[in-house]
Amino acid sequence: QVAAIKDYVIPMCFKDNKADHYIGWDSLRTRINNILTSEKCKVNEDKLLGPFFISKNMLDEIKNNKEQIDELEAKDEASRTEKDNEALKDMHQKENNYIKAFESKVIMYLFEDVMKMRPENIFIGHHKKNGKMIFSEICKAFEQDGEGIFGIEDLENI
């Protein structure tokens, strides 16, 4: 089951009514965990993000949604039916819902439970941009900058 974790993706940055890009969930959580265990944060192992911190059901849903989007977007625009376009619109809305779920699950956990006294040590990218260290501002920044709020700039887009 852990081998399958490498196949899961997370949508990032909701721009132009769709996700700007996707990154691997395992890569992202590993990088966040590396930040959490760094000298600046020194978080205990029991507070790290496990492979299924985001539920397997949601990870499966996200993966299936992305596969359907890729399939429809591979079609020539002129050959897409009205039904295809409506389906794409719905799938892109789901991407936004997944981004919101990431905020309410992962970002909230990191902000409230893990780094409540020092949020600038995990939300490094947001802090460097002089962003306010309040939950709503961090979420807004996440919708614009995705993984960049953690100071992560080099994960492969999928």
How would you name each of these model-derived features?
Residues 1-158:
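C-terminal regulatory/interaction module of P-loop NTP-utilizing enzymes
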